[in-house]
Amino acid sequence: MATGLANGQAVAPSRVTPSTLAPPVGPAGAITVTSPAGLTPPQNASNLSVAISNVTVEGGFPELEAETEAVTAKLRGRRVTVAEIFAAANAIEQAYAARGYVLVRVAVPPQQLKNGGPLRLVVVDGFVESVDVKGVPERQRALVQARLASLIGKRHVTLAEIERRLILASDIPGLVLSSTIARGTAPGGTLLVLEATWSPIAGTFGFDNRLPPSLGNWELNGALAVNSPLGYGEQLYGAASTGYNLGKVFDATTPMQLLGVGAVLPLGVDGLKINPEYTNSVTRPAPVPGAPPDVGYYQRFDLRASYPLILTRAQALTFQATYEWAQEHLSPIGFDTDIYDDQYNVARLQLEDHLRLPYGLLAGTLVFSQGLGGRGETQAALTNVPLSQQGAFPTFSKSGSMQPGRSLCPTICRALIGQAQTSFGHPLFIAEQFSLDGSQAASAYPLGTFSVDEGATLRGEIQRAYPFGWTQGRGTIAPYIFGAASQGWIDDPTAVQPGHINAESFGVGLRLGADTPTPVLPLGATFSIELARGFSNVVGEGQVYRGNVAFAVKF
């Protein structure tokens, strides 16, 4: 194994601890905005014609003057049928819809048309007249109404504004919201009708073999979330992981255990959230021959604040700022000392973007981390307890990115996932290092095998999905092939650390999923199995085979 530890421990606790325990955010519910249906011309409209001298459009938006003029110019000075007049009104309406003004209607008002006379069209600035929330569970009804209140009566409203408010209304933990738009009673008025279901509690339970051999390979994991119990959109959650032997959890000898709690708390109705979270993990790896057994401790407190800068069906751009305090230390069992001790504070700034493009889905994340201070080399020298990495310092800087892309795939899916990190040439604490392994990189190696200060990974997959169905729901069986390459560097390595690491893997796998309980996969479960072949320049990891298994159920 190649980690930042010179003492031979297979993996530090921070390397098997996820960066967050917060439940993933599900997709928005069905958002349906009816496109303009268009005016219906009267009977025999194609047989009635009139010579038009001029066309006036009342109530038009200045930003649509060019599009409007392009349509009306085709009518001026010509003999046109009544059907052509109605078609022109519909064309102007479609031009407004194309610019996002989907509630605008263009009318042909009652008028007496004479040969050589003018034609009058009227643009009606549509608006949301009211929101019908009777189909929303009562406890969440007031919050949904509050998040949509800014739409009511607003003129010049665009599709992007409507989508943002609807997605915010659906962003209530446990709520699955669908919406439709219908014509209201007032001229230009629109009625927004909402239907929703709400799950007050959600959770997952599963197992996998992502851990290294020194930690027993297998782990059991579970998570539980309480969704908006007070009706303010809050979420309280907890997560736990442990080694495969449950009997050892209570006598503190399990190879790995993780506990964490947190809360997602909305502030206001425009998408601002704060997320305090505490995580504690412990590893008790199998001892290296000739060395005493040791135990690693890692704890972390995070306070995150996030805000959606752009929020539509086509794009979600979110900014997040995080303050984090972390401590990690490794102690030999039976000795009153530490092998290393890291304590530091860090601020992180993150931009995360999700795009839905005609050819597929594209997501990117940029993170900049700046150390704010903590235990450094001076304290290490005074206490005779070193840091996890020689040369590391608590005011570090690092930058990372991740760009997963996935094509739209009714049957054949293609995915490309790239990740990278730079530490600007300086060593990092183990908890801040970059992983070259894992399910989204060189998956022939378990978590914690390769941790570096700077590096990059690239993984490609091709998957063929075979849907199947039954009376209660649907599922998919998806075989896939993959290939991955990773490169990394340890800045200022010790004599026992490789300065440069490369790792590649390729193989085949199978994923199964169901959206409802089945005889094979209960509770809407997911199951995956993968056979991977790996290559590396690290001694002992040159050529390996690995089978990866993961199973999870959600409720």
Where on the chain are the PLM-derived regions?
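Short loop/turn motifs that connect adjacent beta-strands in outer-membrane beta-barrel proteins
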Residues: P229-Q235, G268-I274, I310-T318, H354-G364, ...
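Transmembrane beta-barrel strand/turn architecture of Gram-negative outer membrane proteins
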Residues: Q299-L303, F319-Q327, D341-Q350, L366-R375, ...
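Surface-exposed extracellular loop regions of Gram-negative outer-membrane beta-barrel proteins
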Residues: T312-Q327, G364-Q370, F429-L436, Q440, ...
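Outer-membrane beta-barrel translocator domains and adjoining extracellular loop/strand segments
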Residues: K248-L258, P285-P293, H329-D338, R375-T383, ...
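C-terminal transmembrane beta-barrel domains of outer membrane proteins
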Residues: N384-F555
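Gram-negative/organellar outer-membrane beta-barrel architecture
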Residues: E138-A142, T158-G360, Q543-K554
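Transmembrane beta-barrel strands of outer-membrane/channel proteins
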Residues: I181, F205-N209, G222, L236-T242, ...
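Periplasmic polypeptide-binding modules associated with outer-membrane biogenesis and secretion
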Residues: G4-L211, A223, A240-Q257, G418-Q419
